UniProtKB/Swiss-Prot annotation:
Residue ranges of the TM segments: none
Record-linked NCBIfam families: lipid_A_lpxD, PRK00892.1
Signal peptide: none
GO MF annotations, alphabetized: N-acyltransferase activity
Protein name: UDP-3-O-acylglucosamine N-acyltransferase
Length: 340
C-alpha cells in the first residue's frame, strides 16, 4: 500500500491542515487502536474523549471538535465522508475478481464476451449472455442464458445469475449472492402445492451494490426491480416483484416480502421485515428489527419491537401485555364510576 503525506491527504479531502504537512501516513485506524504513522477520525462526539489518549499521528475532525485535539489534524465539514474518501485511496482490497479468461471457464459459443472482460476459474457463461467491457466475474460463478451485465460491473466468487437477468454498469456483487432465483409462488389445490413458474426477471440499475449471500428473486409476471445507486447488505432476502427505488440502503438480514415497493433515499435497518404488498414512501428511515405490516405514506423515522432488558423484567412486561384487554376494561369501568 502506498503511503501519503498529510499535505497530500489534505489536498485530496479539501481539508484545512493544522500541523506537519510532511508527516507520512501509513494506515487508517480507529482512535482507540491507532499507532504512530496512523491517521484516525472522529465522526461521533461520544468518542470525543478518545482524542485525549489516542496514539494517532493525525486525526480528521470537524471544526467543532478541532479544539479537543492538540496534535496534527485535518479539519473537514464531514469527517465520516472524508474517512470514506481516504479509505478508497488507501484500499488494500484486490482490484480484480479475475484477470483474463481462465482456461477452465466454460463460455457458450453464442455468448458475447468483451475482450476487456475477465472470467475466473470454473465459471460458466450460458448461451446469449452479454458480458460488456471491463466486467470481472470471479471464480465458480454461473451466468445464465440471456443475462446482460453492464460495463465495469464486478462479481466476486460463487455468484449465481439466473436466466434473462439484467445488471447495469459499475455494480458490485459480493460472494455467494444469487440473482433471479424463483420467487415463492404456489397455488394450493386440495392440500397439494402447485408451483407457479416465475415468468418475470430481475432488473438491476447502475452502481448497485449487493452484499454476500443476498438473494433477489425473479418476478412472477412483472420484473423485480432494483434501481440505480441502491446498496443492499449481506444475507438479505428480496422477494418477487419487489421494487427498490434509487438511493435506498438496506442493512443485513432484512426481508422484503413479495410486491413490496420501497421509495427513494430510504434507510432500512438490519433484520427488518416488511410484509407483502406494502409500500414505503421516499425518505423513510426504519430502525433495525422493525416489523412493517402497513404501508408508510409519510417520511420520517419508524420503529417497532421491544428493546432488550433482563429476563426477569421482560417476563413481567409480557405478563402485563397479555392482560392489556382486561386492564383496559377495568380502566373504562373506573372511568364510568368517576363520571359526575
Amino acid at each position: 500500500m502506498q503511503n501519503y503525506t498529510l499535505s497530500q491527504i489534505a489536498e485530496l479531502l479539501s481539508a484545512e491542515l493544522q500541523g506537519d504537512g510532511a508527516l507520512e501516513i501509513t494506515k487508517i485506524a480507529t482512535l482507540a487502536h491507532a499507532r504512530s504513522g496512523h491517521i484516525a477520525f472522529l465522526a461521533n462526539k461520544k468518542y470525543r474523549s478518545q482524542l485525549e489518549v489516542t496514539q494517532a499521528s493525525a486525526v480528521i475532525v470537524s471544526e467543532a471538535d478541532a479544539p479537543y485535539f492538540n496534535g496534527n489534524k485535518l479539519i473537514v465539514a464531514n469527517p465520516y465522508v472524508s474517512y470514506a474518501k481516504l479509505a478508497q485511496l488507501m484500499d488494500t482490497t484486490p482490484r480484480s475478481a479475475a484477470t483474463g479468461i481462465h482456461p477452465s471457464a466454460v463460455v457458450h459459443p453464442n455468448a458475447t464476451v468483451s475482450k476487456s472482460a475477465a472470467i475466473g476459474a470454473n465459471t460458466v457463461i450460458e448461451s446469449n449472455a452479454i458480458i460488456n467491457d471491463n466486467v470481472q466475474i470471479g471464480p465458480n460463478s454461473f451466468i445464465g442464458e440471456g443475462v446482460k451485465i453492464g460495463s465495469g460491473t464486478k462479481l466476486w466468487s460463487n455468484v449465481t445469475i439466473y436466466h434473462n437477468v439484467e445488471i447495469g454498469s459499475d455494480c458490485l456483487l459480493q460472494a455467494n449472492s444469487v440473482i433471479g432465483s424463483d420467487g415463492f409462488g404456489y397455488a394450493n389445490e386440495r392440500g397439494q402445492w402447485i408451483k407457479i413458474p416465475q415468468l418475470g426477471s430481475v432488473i438491476i440499475g447502475d452502481k448497485v451494490e449487493i452484499g454476500a449471500s443476498t438473494t433477489i428473486d425473479r418476478g412472477a409476471l412483472d420484473d423485480t426491480i432494483i434501481h440505480s445507486n441502491v446498496i443492499i447488505d449481506n444475507q438479505c432476502q428480496i422477494a418477487h416483484n419487489v421494487e427498490v427505488n434509487s438511493g435506498t440502503a438496506i442493512a443485513g438480514c432484512t426481508v422484503l416480502a413479495g410486491s413490496v415497493t420501497i421509495g427513494k433515499n430510504c434507510q432500512i435497518g438490519g433484520m427488518t421485515a416488511i410484509n407483502g404488498h406494502m409500500s414505503v414512501c421516499d425518505g423513510v428511515i426504519i430502525t433495525g428489527m422493525s416489523m412493517v405490516t402497513k404501508s408508510i405514506t409519510e417520511p420520517g423515522i419508524y420503529s417497532s419491537g421491544i428493546p432488550h432488558t433482563t429476563n426477569k423484567e421482560w417476563r413481567k412486561s409480557i405478563a402485563h401485555l397479555r392482560n392489556l384487554s382486561e386492564m383496559k376494561s377495568r380502566i373504562k369501568a373506573l372511568e364510568q364510576l368517576n363520571k359526575p
